[in-house]
Protein backbone atom coordinates (compact mmCIF):
# COMPACT_ATOMS: atom_id res chain seq x y z
CA UNK A 1 0.00 0.00 0.00
CA UNK A 2 2.78 2.43 0.90
CA UNK A 3 4.54 1.84 -2.41
CA UNK A 4 1.28 2.31 -4.32
CA UNK A 5 0.67 5.55 -2.41
CA UNK A 6 4.09 6.92 -3.34
CA UNK A 7 3.69 5.76 -6.93
CA UNK A 8 0.57 7.92 -7.13
CA UNK A 9 2.39 10.89 -5.58
CA UNK A 10 5.23 10.52 -8.09
CA UNK A 11 2.79 10.23 -11.01
CA UNK A 12 1.02 13.46 -10.03
CA UNK A 13 4.29 15.35 -9.55
CA UNK A 14 5.85 13.99 -12.74
CA UNK A 15 2.73 14.71 -14.78
CA UNK A 16 2.57 18.29 -13.50
CA UNK A 17 6.15 18.89 -14.63
CA UNK A 18 5.48 17.39 -18.06
CA UNK A 19 2.33 19.45 -18.61
CA UNK A 20 3.58 22.76 -17.26
CA UNK A 21 5.54 23.68 -20.38
CA UNK A 22 3.94 22.68 -23.67
CA UNK A 23 5.96 23.25 -26.81
CA UNK A 24 5.05 26.56 -28.45
CA UNK A 25 6.48 29.04 -30.90
CA UNK A 26 9.58 31.13 -30.38
CA UNK A 27 7.94 33.94 -28.38
CA UNK A 28 7.53 33.10 -24.71
CA UNK A 29 4.60 34.48 -22.78
CA UNK A 30 5.29 35.21 -19.11
CA UNK A 31 2.43 35.96 -16.73
CA UNK A 32 3.21 37.38 -13.29
CA UNK A 33 0.38 37.54 -10.77
CA UNK A 34 0.96 40.23 -8.14
CA UNK A 35 -1.99 39.02 -6.06
CA UNK A 36 -0.99 35.34 -6.06
CA UNK A 37 1.80 35.08 -3.50
CA UNK A 38 3.26 31.58 -3.27
CA UNK A 39 4.85 32.30 0.08
CA UNK A 40 7.72 33.90 1.92
CA UNK A 41 11.23 33.08 0.74
CA UNK A 42 13.51 32.06 3.57
CA UNK A 43 16.88 33.74 2.88
CA UNK A 44 18.61 30.57 4.08
CA UNK A 45 17.96 29.04 0.64
CA UNK A 46 21.00 31.00 -0.56
CA UNK A 47 23.24 29.10 1.86
CA UNK A 48 26.62 27.40 1.74
CA UNK A 49 28.49 24.32 2.92
CA UNK A 50 32.12 23.78 3.88
CA UNK A 51 33.73 20.44 4.70
CA UNK A 52 37.11 19.10 5.70
CA UNK A 53 37.60 17.78 2.18
CA UNK A 54 40.51 18.31 -0.20
CA UNK A 55 41.37 22.04 -0.08
CA UNK A 56 38.01 23.45 0.91
CA UNK A 57 39.15 24.41 4.41
CA UNK A 58 42.87 23.61 4.61
CA UNK A 59 44.47 25.36 1.65
CA UNK A 60 41.29 27.30 0.97
CA UNK A 61 39.58 29.07 3.85
CA UNK A 62 42.41 28.27 6.26
CA UNK A 63 46.04 29.02 5.47
CA UNK A 64 48.69 27.83 7.92
CA UNK A 65 47.23 28.64 11.33
CA UNK A 66 44.98 31.50 10.27
CA UNK A 67 42.28 32.47 7.82
CA UNK A 68 42.96 33.25 4.20
CA UNK A 69 41.46 36.71 4.42
CA UNK A 70 41.22 37.12 0.65
CA UNK A 71 38.87 34.13 0.63
CA UNK A 72 36.99 35.58 3.61
CA UNK A 73 36.49 38.82 1.68
CA UNK A 74 35.09 36.90 -1.28
CA UNK A 75 32.71 35.06 1.06
CA UNK A 76 31.58 38.41 2.46
CA UNK A 77 30.76 39.45 -1.09
CA UNK A 78 28.12 36.71 -1.19
CA UNK A 79 26.33 38.02 1.90
CA UNK A 80 25.88 34.41 3.03
CA UNK A 81 22.82 33.70 5.21
CA UNK A 82 23.85 30.29 6.58
CA UNK A 83 26.86 27.97 6.45
CA UNK A 84 26.93 24.22 7.14
CA UNK A 85 29.99 22.50 8.68
CA UNK A 86 31.98 20.19 9.28
CA UNK A 87 30.44 17.76 6.77
CA UNK A 88 29.41 15.90 4.82
CA UNK A 89 30.98 12.49 5.11
CA UNK A 90 33.66 13.97 7.34
CA UNK A 91 31.08 14.63 10.07
CA UNK A 92 30.46 10.91 10.62
CA UNK A 93 33.95 10.46 12.04
CA UNK A 94 34.54 13.89 13.58
CA UNK A 95 34.82 14.33 17.34
CA UNK A 96 34.41 17.98 18.11
CA UNK A 97 36.64 18.09 21.20
CA UNK A 98 39.64 17.29 19.00
CA UNK A 99 39.19 20.73 17.44
CA UNK A 100 39.09 23.04 20.48
CA UNK A 101 41.70 24.51 22.80
CA UNK A 102 45.20 25.75 21.92
CA UNK A 103 45.97 24.85 18.31
CA UNK A 104 49.38 23.44 19.19
CA UNK A 105 47.77 20.93 21.57
CA UNK A 106 45.15 19.58 19.18
CA UNK A 107 45.64 16.01 17.97
CA UNK A 108 46.21 15.17 14.34
CA UNK A 109 43.63 12.62 13.24
CA UNK A 110 43.32 10.41 10.19
CA UNK A 111 40.02 11.05 8.45
CA UNK A 112 38.49 7.79 7.22
CA UNK A 113 35.94 9.56 5.02
CA UNK A 114 38.46 11.21 2.70
CA UNK A 115 41.63 9.30 3.70
CA UNK A 116 43.60 12.34 4.77
CA UNK A 117 45.29 13.66 7.90
CA UNK A 118 43.32 16.42 9.61
CA UNK A 119 45.43 18.73 11.82
CA UNK A 120 42.31 19.96 13.68
CA UNK A 121 43.56 23.53 13.50
CA UNK A 122 40.13 24.56 12.20
CA UNK A 123 37.48 23.61 14.75
CA UNK A 124 34.32 24.91 16.38
CA UNK A 125 35.71 28.24 17.57
CA UNK A 126 37.29 28.96 14.18
CA UNK A 127 34.06 28.05 12.38
CA UNK A 128 32.04 30.38 14.59
CA UNK A 129 34.60 33.13 14.04
CA UNK A 130 34.27 32.67 10.28
CA UNK A 131 30.50 32.91 10.53
CA UNK A 132 30.80 36.08 12.60
CA UNK A 133 33.24 37.63 10.13
CA UNK A 134 30.91 37.03 7.17
CA UNK A 135 27.72 37.65 9.19
CA UNK A 136 25.96 34.32 8.65
CA UNK A 137 24.16 31.72 10.75
CA UNK A 138 26.26 28.68 11.71
CA UNK A 139 24.77 25.27 10.94
CA UNK A 140 26.61 22.40 12.65
CA UNK A 141 26.22 18.76 11.63
CA UNK A 142 26.83 16.39 14.55
CA UNK A 143 28.49 12.98 14.36
CA UNK A 144 25.85 10.24 14.25
CA UNK A 145 28.21 7.79 12.55
CA UNK A 146 30.74 7.09 15.30
CA UNK A 147 29.50 9.65 17.84
CA UNK A 148 26.94 9.51 20.63
CA UNK A 149 23.92 11.52 21.70
CA UNK A 150 25.86 12.57 24.80
CA UNK A 151 28.72 13.93 22.68
CA UNK A 152 26.24 15.88 20.54
CA UNK A 153 24.45 17.31 23.58
CA UNK A 154 27.81 18.33 25.05
CA UNK A 155 28.56 20.18 21.82
CA UNK A 156 25.32 22.14 22.21
CA UNK A 157 26.37 22.95 25.80
CA UNK A 158 29.75 24.20 24.58
CA UNK A 159 28.14 26.43 21.97
CA UNK A 160 24.96 27.67 23.60
CA UNK A 161 24.96 27.56 27.40
CA UNK A 162 26.01 30.62 29.42
CA UNK A 163 29.17 30.72 31.50
CA UNK A 164 28.81 28.76 34.72
CA UNK A 165 25.99 26.55 33.41
CA UNK A 166 28.11 23.46 32.74
CA UNK A 167 31.60 22.07 32.34
CA UNK A 168 31.41 22.48 28.57
CA UNK A 169 30.13 26.05 28.74
CA UNK A 170 33.02 26.89 31.04
CA UNK A 171 35.39 25.13 28.66
CA UNK A 172 34.29 27.56 25.96
CA UNK A 173 35.00 30.44 28.35
CA UNK A 174 38.40 28.94 29.13
CA UNK A 175 39.12 28.92 25.41
CA UNK A 176 38.49 32.66 25.29
CA UNK A 177 34.82 32.93 24.39
CA UNK A 178 32.73 34.33 27.23
CA UNK A 179 29.43 34.72 25.41
CA UNK A 180 27.43 31.75 24.11
CA UNK A 181 27.51 31.26 20.36
CA UNK A 182 23.78 30.69 20.01
CA UNK A 183 24.01 28.08 17.26
CA UNK A 184 20.45 27.56 16.06
CA UNK A 185 20.72 24.89 13.36
CA UNK A 186 21.98 21.36 14.09
CA UNK A 187 22.14 18.51 11.61
CA UNK A 188 21.51 14.98 12.88
CA UNK A 189 24.25 13.18 10.98
CA UNK A 190 25.00 12.93 7.29
CA UNK A 191 23.81 10.48 4.62
CA UNK A 192 23.61 7.52 6.99
CA UNK A 193 21.53 5.68 4.39
CA UNK A 194 24.70 5.15 2.32
CA UNK A 195 27.26 2.36 2.71
CA UNK A 196 30.01 4.92 2.06
CA UNK A 197 29.21 6.45 5.43
CA UNK A 198 30.74 5.61 8.81
CA UNK A 199 27.79 4.31 10.79
CA UNK A 200 25.69 3.32 7.76
CA UNK A 201 22.37 2.00 8.97
CA UNK A 202 18.76 1.32 8.01
CA UNK A 203 15.95 3.88 8.19
CA UNK A 204 14.32 2.45 11.31
CA UNK A 205 17.54 2.43 13.33
CA UNK A 206 18.50 5.89 12.12
CA UNK A 207 15.07 7.27 13.03
CA UNK A 208 15.28 5.90 16.57
CA UNK A 209 18.77 7.34 17.00
CA UNK A 210 17.82 10.70 15.49
CA UNK A 211 14.90 10.95 17.89
CA UNK A 212 17.21 10.34 20.85
CA UNK A 213 19.90 12.73 19.60
CA UNK A 214 17.37 15.50 19.00
CA UNK A 215 15.76 15.00 22.41
CA UNK A 216 19.08 15.18 24.25
CA UNK A 217 20.23 18.22 22.28
CA UNK A 218 16.94 20.10 22.72
CA UNK A 219 16.92 19.35 26.43
CA UNK A 220 20.15 21.36 26.58
CA UNK A 221 18.72 24.20 24.47
CA UNK A 222 15.04 24.03 23.49
CA UNK A 223 15.45 26.88 21.02
CA UNK A 224 17.57 24.93 18.54
CA UNK A 225 16.30 23.50 15.26
CA UNK A 226 17.34 19.99 14.23
CA UNK A 227 17.65 18.60 10.71
CA UNK A 228 17.18 14.86 10.15
CA UNK A 229 18.77 12.92 7.31
CA UNK A 230 16.46 12.45 4.35
CA UNK A 231 17.08 11.19 0.83
CA UNK A 232 15.42 10.48 -2.50
CA UNK A 233 13.85 7.29 -1.13
CA UNK A 234 10.27 7.86 0.09
CA UNK A 235 10.35 4.76 2.31
CA UNK A 236 13.42 6.02 4.20
CA UNK A 237 11.83 9.45 4.62
CA UNK A 238 8.51 7.95 5.74
CA UNK A 239 10.20 5.91 8.47
CA UNK A 240 12.20 8.90 9.71
CA UNK A 241 9.16 11.17 9.74
CA UNK A 242 6.90 8.67 11.48
CA UNK A 243 9.39 7.93 14.28
CA UNK A 244 11.43 11.12 14.69
CA UNK A 245 8.97 13.61 13.21
CA UNK A 246 7.70 15.13 16.49
CA UNK A 247 11.29 15.86 17.54
CA UNK A 248 12.75 17.38 14.36
CA UNK A 249 12.24 20.62 12.43
CA UNK A 250 13.71 19.80 9.02
CA UNK A 251 14.49 16.80 6.87
CA UNK A 252 17.34 17.01 4.38
CA UNK A 253 17.85 16.12 0.74
CA UNK A 254 21.13 15.93 -1.18
CA UNK A 255 21.20 16.03 -4.99
CA UNK A 256 24.17 16.02 -7.37
CA UNK A 257 23.94 15.85 -11.15
CA UNK A 258 26.39 14.90 -13.89
CA UNK A 259 25.98 14.66 -17.64
CA UNK A 260 28.28 15.50 -20.56
CA UNK A 261 25.49 17.19 -22.52
CA UNK A 262 24.87 20.86 -21.76
CA UNK A 263 21.10 20.71 -22.16
CA UNK A 264 20.82 17.74 -19.82
CA UNK A 265 22.95 19.47 -17.20
CA UNK A 266 20.83 22.61 -17.20
CA UNK A 267 17.64 20.49 -17.20
CA UNK A 268 18.62 18.86 -13.89
CA UNK A 269 17.08 21.58 -11.66
CA UNK A 270 13.69 20.26 -12.81
CA UNK A 271 14.73 16.81 -11.63
CA UNK A 272 15.59 18.43 -8.29
CA UNK A 273 12.17 20.11 -8.32
CA UNK A 274 10.54 16.71 -8.79
CA UNK A 275 12.51 15.23 -5.86
CA UNK A 276 11.74 18.18 -3.59
CA UNK A 277 8.02 18.00 -4.42
CA UNK A 278 8.03 14.30 -3.67
CA UNK A 279 9.68 14.90 -0.30
CA UNK A 280 7.18 17.66 0.50
CA UNK A 281 4.34 15.27 -0.35
CA UNK A 282 5.87 12.63 1.91
CA UNK A 283 6.08 15.10 4.80
CA UNK A 284 2.43 15.99 4.38
CA UNK A 285 1.34 12.36 4.07
CA UNK A 286 3.37 11.20 7.08
CA UNK A 287 2.64 14.06 9.47
CA UNK A 288 -0.60 15.57 8.19
CA UNK A 289 0.93 19.05 8.17
CA UNK A 290 3.74 21.13 6.72
CA UNK A 291 5.50 22.05 9.98
CA UNK A 292 8.64 20.10 9.05
CA UNK A 293 10.52 21.90 6.30
CA UNK A 294 13.09 20.72 3.79
CA UNK A 295 16.82 21.43 4.08
CA UNK A 296 18.26 20.99 0.59
CA UNK A 297 21.66 21.21 2.21
CA UNK A 298 23.86 19.69 -0.48
CA UNK A 299 23.30 20.44 -4.17
CA UNK A 300 25.53 20.93 -7.18
CA UNK A 301 26.83 19.56 -10.45
CA UNK A 302 29.56 16.95 -10.09
CA UNK A 303 31.57 18.79 -12.69
CA UNK A 304 30.61 22.46 -12.57
CA UNK A 305 32.08 24.09 -15.66
CA UNK A 306 31.90 27.61 -16.95
CA UNK A 307 28.77 29.57 -17.67
CA UNK A 308 26.78 26.30 -17.84
CA UNK A 309 27.18 25.89 -14.08
CA UNK A 310 25.80 29.41 -13.57
CA UNK A 311 22.78 28.58 -15.76
CA UNK A 312 22.28 25.44 -13.63
CA UNK A 313 22.50 27.41 -10.36
CA UNK A 314 20.00 30.00 -11.56
CA UNK A 315 17.64 27.16 -12.45
CA UNK A 316 17.95 25.82 -8.90
CA UNK A 317 17.09 29.21 -7.40
CA UNK A 318 14.03 29.59 -9.62
CA UNK A 319 12.91 26.16 -8.38
CA UNK A 320 13.50 27.17 -4.76
CA UNK A 321 11.43 30.32 -5.24
CA UNK A 322 8.56 28.19 -6.54
CA UNK A 323 8.90 25.78 -3.61
CA UNK A 324 9.48 28.41 -0.92
CA UNK A 325 6.64 27.08 1.26
CA UNK A 326 8.49 23.80 1.69
CA UNK A 327 12.23 24.45 1.29
CA UNK A 328 13.63 26.75 3.98
CA UNK A 329 17.34 25.88 3.82
CA UNK A 330 19.58 25.14 0.84
CA UNK A 331 23.37 24.89 0.78
CA UNK A 332 25.53 24.60 -2.30
CA UNK A 333 28.30 22.04 -1.91
CA UNK A 334 30.87 23.43 -1.55
CA UNK A 335 31.93 27.00 -1.07
CA UNK A 336 35.69 26.86 -1.71
CA UNK A 337 37.86 24.72 -4.04
CA UNK A 338 35.54 21.67 -4.20
CA UNK A 339 32.85 22.14 -6.90
CA UNK A 340 33.26 25.70 -5.73
CA UNK A 341 31.99 29.24 -5.87
CA UNK A 342 35.49 30.41 -4.89
CA UNK A 343 38.86 29.07 -6.03
CA UNK A 344 42.03 29.59 -3.97
CA UNK A 345 45.20 28.15 -5.48
CA UNK A 346 48.67 29.12 -6.63
CA UNK A 347 47.09 31.53 -9.14
CA UNK A 348 45.30 33.42 -6.39
CA UNK A 349 41.76 33.77 -5.09
CA UNK A 350 38.88 34.27 -7.52
CA UNK A 351 35.17 33.64 -8.03
CA UNK A 352 33.66 31.08 -10.40
CA UNK A 353 30.65 31.82 -12.65
CA UNK A 354 28.04 30.59 -10.14
CA UNK A 355 29.39 33.07 -7.58
CA UNK A 356 27.70 35.86 -9.52
CA UNK A 357 24.40 33.99 -9.63
CA UNK A 358 24.40 33.85 -5.83
CA UNK A 359 25.17 37.55 -5.69
CA UNK A 360 22.34 38.48 -8.05
CA UNK A 361 19.67 36.47 -6.26
CA UNK A 362 20.88 37.45 -2.80
CA UNK A 363 21.06 41.16 -3.68
CA UNK A 364 17.86 41.51 -5.68
CA UNK A 365 15.32 38.88 -4.62
CA UNK A 366 12.47 40.16 -2.50
CA UNK A 367 10.95 38.29 0.44
CA UNK A 368 7.77 37.11 -1.35
CA UNK A 369 7.62 34.66 -4.25
CA UNK A 370 4.94 35.34 -6.86
CA UNK A 371 3.07 32.88 -9.05
CA UNK A 372 4.53 32.93 -12.55
CA UNK A 373 3.17 31.13 -15.62
CA UNK A 374 5.51 30.51 -18.53
CA UNK A 375 4.20 29.46 -21.93
CA UNK A 376 6.93 28.91 -24.49
CA UNK A 377 9.15 26.52 -26.38
CA UNK A 378 10.70 23.59 -24.55
CA UNK A 379 12.94 20.59 -25.15
CA UNK A 380 12.79 17.04 -23.84
CA UNK A 381 15.23 15.79 -21.20
CA UNK A 382 15.63 12.02 -20.78
CA UNK A 383 18.64 11.84 -18.46
CA UNK A 384 16.92 12.05 -15.07
CA UNK A 385 14.29 9.32 -15.16
CA UNK A 386 11.44 9.44 -17.65
CA UNK A 387 10.95 12.49 -19.84
CA UNK A 388 10.90 16.06 -18.57
CA UNK A 389 9.83 18.98 -20.74
CA UNK A 390 12.34 21.73 -20.05
CA UNK A 391 11.43 25.34 -20.89
CA UNK A 392 14.13 27.33 -22.61
CA UNK A 393 12.84 30.35 -20.69
CA UNK A 394 12.48 29.81 -16.93
CA UNK A 395 11.21 32.69 -14.81
CA UNK A 396 10.69 33.45 -11.14
CA UNK A 397 9.49 36.72 -9.65
CA UNK A 398 9.57 38.26 -6.19
CA UNK A 399 7.92 41.19 -4.46
CA UNK A 400 8.99 43.40 -1.59
CA UNK A 401 5.81 45.02 -0.26
CA UNK A 402 7.74 47.46 1.93
CA UNK A 403 9.21 49.15 -1.16
CA UNK A 404 6.83 47.86 -3.88
CA UNK A 405 9.90 46.39 -5.59
CA UNK A 406 9.20 43.76 -8.23
CA UNK A 407 12.13 41.60 -9.32
CA UNK A 408 11.97 39.27 -12.32
CA UNK A 409 14.62 36.58 -12.88
CA UNK A 410 14.66 35.43 -16.52
CA UNK A 411 16.82 32.43 -17.36
CA UNK A 412 17.44 31.56 -21.03
CA UNK A 413 18.82 28.02 -21.30
CA UNK A 414 19.09 28.21 -25.09
CA UNK A 415 22.78 28.22 -25.95
CA UNK A 416 22.21 29.28 -29.56
CA UNK A 417 19.67 32.08 -29.74
CA UNK A 418 18.01 34.93 -27.92
CA UNK A 419 14.34 34.56 -27.05
CA UNK A 420 11.72 37.26 -26.97
CA UNK A 421 9.48 37.33 -23.90
CA UNK A 422 6.12 39.04 -23.62
CA UNK A 423 5.76 39.82 -19.92
CA UNK A 424 2.31 40.54 -18.56
CA UNK A 425 1.81 41.77 -14.98
CA UNK A 426 -1.67 40.89 -13.85
CA UNK A 427 -3.80 43.14 -11.64
CA UNK A 428 -1.62 46.20 -12.14
CA UNK A 429 -2.09 49.30 -14.24
CA UNK A 430 0.76 51.71 -14.33
CA UNK A 431 4.20 52.53 -15.61
CA UNK A 432 7.55 52.23 -13.87
CA UNK A 433 11.20 52.58 -14.69
CA UNK A 434 13.20 49.42 -14.17
CA UNK A 435 16.85 48.44 -14.15
CA UNK A 436 18.29 45.46 -16.02
CA UNK A 437 21.30 43.31 -15.13
CA UNK A 438 22.58 40.49 -17.30
CA UNK A 439 24.94 37.62 -16.42
CA UNK A 440 26.54 36.13 -19.51
CA UNK A 441 29.71 35.00 -21.25
CA UNK A 442 30.90 34.24 -24.76
CA UNK A 443 29.69 30.61 -24.61
CA UNK A 444 28.41 28.04 -22.12
CA UNK A 445 31.85 26.58 -21.42
CA UNK A 446 33.51 29.91 -20.72
CA UNK A 447 34.76 30.70 -17.22
CA UNK A 448 34.97 34.36 -18.18
CA UNK A 449 31.56 35.71 -17.26
CA UNK A 450 30.42 39.07 -16.04
CA UNK A 451 27.38 40.90 -14.79
CA UNK A 452 26.55 43.94 -16.90
CA UNK A 453 24.06 46.69 -16.21
CA UNK A 454 21.95 46.88 -19.36
CA UNK A 455 20.40 50.22 -18.54
CA UNK A 456 16.79 51.17 -18.03
CA UNK A 457 13.59 49.47 -19.12
CA UNK A 458 10.03 50.76 -18.97
CA UNK A 459 7.80 48.33 -17.10
CA UNK A 460 4.14 48.42 -18.14
CA UNK A 461 1.28 45.94 -17.63
CA UNK A 462 2.49 44.24 -20.82
CA UNK A 463 6.04 44.75 -22.05
CA UNK A 464 8.64 42.82 -24.01
CA UNK A 465 12.19 41.80 -23.27
CA UNK A 466 14.59 39.77 -25.38
CA UNK A 467 16.64 37.39 -23.24
CA UNK A 468 20.08 36.78 -24.78
CA UNK A 469 21.27 33.23 -25.37
CA UNK A 470 22.70 31.40 -22.32
CA UNK A 471 21.95 34.24 -19.92
CA UNK A 472 20.41 35.20 -16.62
CA UNK A 473 18.61 38.55 -16.64
CA UNK A 474 17.37 40.43 -13.59
CA UNK A 475 14.74 43.14 -14.10
CA UNK A 476 13.92 45.24 -11.07
CA UNK A 477 11.54 48.13 -10.63
CA UNK A 478 9.39 49.87 -8.06
CA UNK A 479 5.73 49.68 -8.97
CA UNK A 480 3.06 52.15 -7.96
CA UNK A 481 0.83 49.72 -6.06
For each of these PLM feature ranges, what is it?
Residues 254-268:
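Active-site His/acidic residue clusters
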Amino acid sequence: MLRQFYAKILLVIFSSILLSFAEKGDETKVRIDLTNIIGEINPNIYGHFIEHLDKCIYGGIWKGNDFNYKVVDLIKGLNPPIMRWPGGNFASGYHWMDGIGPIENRPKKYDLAWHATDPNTFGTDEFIKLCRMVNCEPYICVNMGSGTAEEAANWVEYCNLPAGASYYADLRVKNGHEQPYGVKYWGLGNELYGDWQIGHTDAHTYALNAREFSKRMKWVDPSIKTIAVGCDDPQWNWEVLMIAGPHIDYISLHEYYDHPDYYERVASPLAAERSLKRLAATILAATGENRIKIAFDEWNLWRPQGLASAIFSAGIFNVLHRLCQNVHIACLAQLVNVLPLIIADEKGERPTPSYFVFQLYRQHAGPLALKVDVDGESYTSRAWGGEIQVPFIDVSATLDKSSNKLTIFILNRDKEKSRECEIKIRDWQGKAEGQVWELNGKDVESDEVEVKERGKIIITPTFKYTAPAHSLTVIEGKLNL
